[in-house]
Curated annotation (Swiss-Prot):
Protein's name in the database: Large ribosomal subunit protein uL3
InterPro entries reported in the protein's UniProt record: Ribosomal_uL3 (IPR000597), Ribosomal_uL3_bac/org-type (IPR019927), Ribosomal_uL3_CS (IPR019926), Transl_B-barrel_sf (IPR009000)
One of the GO biological process terms: translation
Nucleotide-binding listed as a keyword: no
Annotated Gene Ontology cellular component terms: cytosolic large ribosomal subunit
Ranges where the record places region Disordered: 132-153
Entry keyword Transferase: no
Gene: rplC
Comp. bias (Polar residues): 133-145
Gene3D superfamilies membership: 3.30.160.810, Translation factors (2.40.30.10)
Function: One of the primary rRNA binding proteins, it binds directly near the 3'-end of the 23S rRNA, where it nucleates assembly of the 50S subunit.
Post-translational modification: Methylated by PrmB.
PROSITE patterns: RIBOSOMAL_L3
Length: 220
């Protein structure tokens, strides 16, 4: 895994190209990541860097976490995220370093992870796009029910994983291969083409795309 940034989803807007085309973008505030811990193979069994984002009052920080941050000399943040990196990259970092938006570049493809908006308890039609039953013609009380969920006498049970009603949303999702349209270094903002999981002010983790296809140069 490559080094990335953790931040917050600001919202959506649009930007215009020089040709006048409108591009929908999501604004991400991702600057000011502080290094709180550097893990190595010798001490932890793997190599990674731990960063924090945002600010938190000292009264809202647990004593174990306060000691952990004091050791790094870092101000308490709202969230802590870990990125797996190689030993060469880890050697370039030290406790207290700040990682900003200059980690990325315009037109770079990234993966963005966030927590989807919770929808509460939902039925199978909303949750899994099941078809509803007939409105009439013999159907009186089965308009929005999922239908049969079982099998015959053998196996005589409902298989695990059967799509049924339940809590919808509020799960971690990753959108891959989003393109960075603009970078506002002064305000530490990334403008990413397309939608990103989660509500406004929700935390997001931004990292270089793992499935990005190499750009092929156009033939002369």
């Amino acid at each position: 895994m490559s080094l990335g940034l953790v931040g917050r989803k600001v919202g959506m807007t649009r930007v215009f190209t020089d040709d006048g085309d409108s591009i929908p973008v999501t604004v991400l505030e991702v600057g000011g990541n502080r290094v709180t811990q550097i893990k190595t193979d010798e001490t932890d069994g793997y190599t990674a860097v731990q960063v924090t984002f945002g600010t938190r009052r000292a009264s809202r920080v647990t004593k174990p976490l306060a000691g952990h941050l004091a050791k790094a000399g870092v101000e308490a943040g709202e969230i802590i995220v870990e990125f797996r990196i190689d030993a060469t990259k880890a050697a370039e970092l030290k406790l207290g370093d700040t990682i900003d938006v200059d980690l990325f570049s315009v037109d770079q493809k990234i993966d963005v992870q966030g927590t989807t908006i919770g929808k509460g308890y939902a039925g199978t039609i909303k949750r899994y796009h099941f078809s509803s039953g007939r409105a009439s013609h013999g159907n009186s009380r089965s308009h929005n029910v999922p239908g049969s969920i079982g099998m015959a006498q053998d196996p005589g049970r409902v298989f695990p994983g059967k799509r049924m009603t339940g809590h919808m949303g509020d799960v971690t999702r990753t959108v891959q291969n989003l393109v960075i349209v603009r970078i506002d270094a002064e305000r530490k903002l990334l403008l990413v083409k397309g939608a990103v999981p989660g509500a406004k002010s929700g935390f997001v983790v931004v990292s270089p795309a793992v499935k990005a296809k190499p750009q092929v140069a156009a033939a002369a």
